[in-house]
Amino acid sequence: MSAEKAKAYWQLMRMDRPIGSLLLLWPTVWALVIAAQGIPSWDVLIVFVLGVFLMRSAGCVINDFADRKVDGHVKRTKQRPLPSGKVTAKEAIGLFLVLAVSSFLLVLTMNPLTIQLSFAGLVLAFIYPFMKRYTHIPQLFLGLAFSWAIPMAWAAQTGELPVMVWFVFVINALWTIAYDTQYAMVDRDDDLKIGIKSTAILFGRHDKLIIGVLQLVTLAMLVGLGQFYQLGQSYYWTVLIAASLFVYQQHLIRHRERDLCFRAFLNNNYVGMVIAIGLLVAFW
């Protein structure tokens, strides 16, 4: 394999832009810490950290495969490996299969419940990229896909799925819809021209308000999470920091400028990180 081809594969997997992997990683860490009531098992932690990066890369590859005929018409994506011809569709499918199989081999080291849950996770990862052609709520499907690591991680750590798993699942799904709507605001004008659907288009002039409502509900549920587990003051400080980050994001998207909407999206990495830190400190 040439250096140029390897670089194209690297870019196709978004390894040069790890924001998506980080946004998937932090909620997985939340689940592991809560399930373990502290530091999770090292073998489980390693499997899920590796799995996050492998499955996020697989998701990016299948997403670009699904969008290969439209990405060339979008300013932000026209230089991606598939529309630019650096990687063929056949090569992309092959890479997706390698990444998906590698992820599954990791899951096979976990308990039977985790293995069973992984099949639904793979289905969600595969169908999400195609939803933007058929529904205005692909962000909901991304929320489900990005949250599925939560029950998987919980099951791997404890072997069971208590009700609070699904409470954390909903927290993350709502937050994901909010930040992916910010991301969709970047491409809204291009998406309207080529017929791609998104919540940014569906929400229209109410986009900022609905994002704000989703963020408020996320914060309220994070507070509820702390109350359920009787977490200390340190946790609530991190929720307050997350709230301030949401306020900053609202400031960034106020004029719906592409670059600032993208900055707001990127800022969500810090939201996930501070909540992970808060949970770790509280449960330690």
UniProtKB/Swiss-Prot annotation:
Pathway the protein takes part in: Cofactor biosynthesis; ubiquinone biosynthesis
Domain of life: Bacteria
Catalytic activity: all-trans-octaprenyl diphosphate + 4-hydroxybenzoate = 4-hydroxy-3-(all-trans-octaprenyl)benzoate + diphosphate
Protein localization: Cell inner membrane
A Pfam family that the UniProt record links to this protein: UbiA
InterPro entries given in the database record: HB_polyprenyltransferase-like, Prenyltransferase, UbiA_prenyltransferase, UbiA_sf
Transmembrane segments: 33-53, 93-113, 136-156, 159-179, 209-229, 235-252, 264-284
GO terms of biological process kind: ubiquinone biosynthetic process
Primary residence: membrane
Any one GO molecular function term: 4-hydroxybenzoate polyprenyltransferase activity
Cofactor entry: Mg(2+)
Keywords: Cell inner membrane, Cell membrane, Magnesium, Membrane, Transferase, Transmembrane, Transmembrane helix, Ubiquinone biosynthesis
Membrane topology according to the record: Multi-pass membrane protein
EC number: 2.5.1.39
UniProt keyword tRNA processing present: no
Entry's Gene Ontology cellular component terms: plasma membrane
Record bears the keyword Transmembrane helix: yes
Gene3D superfamilies the UniProt entry points to: UbiA prenyltransferase
Top-level EC class: transferase
Biological role: Catalyzes the prenylation of para-hydroxybenzoate (PHB) with an all-trans polyprenyl group. Mediates the second step in the final reaction sequence of ubiquinone-8 (UQ-8) biosynthesis, which is the condensation of the polyisoprenoid side chain with PHB, generating the first membrane-bound Q intermediate 3-octaprenyl-4-hydroxybenzoate.
Family: Belongs to the UbiA prenyltransferase family.
Protein's UniProt name: 4-hydroxybenzoate octaprenyltransferase
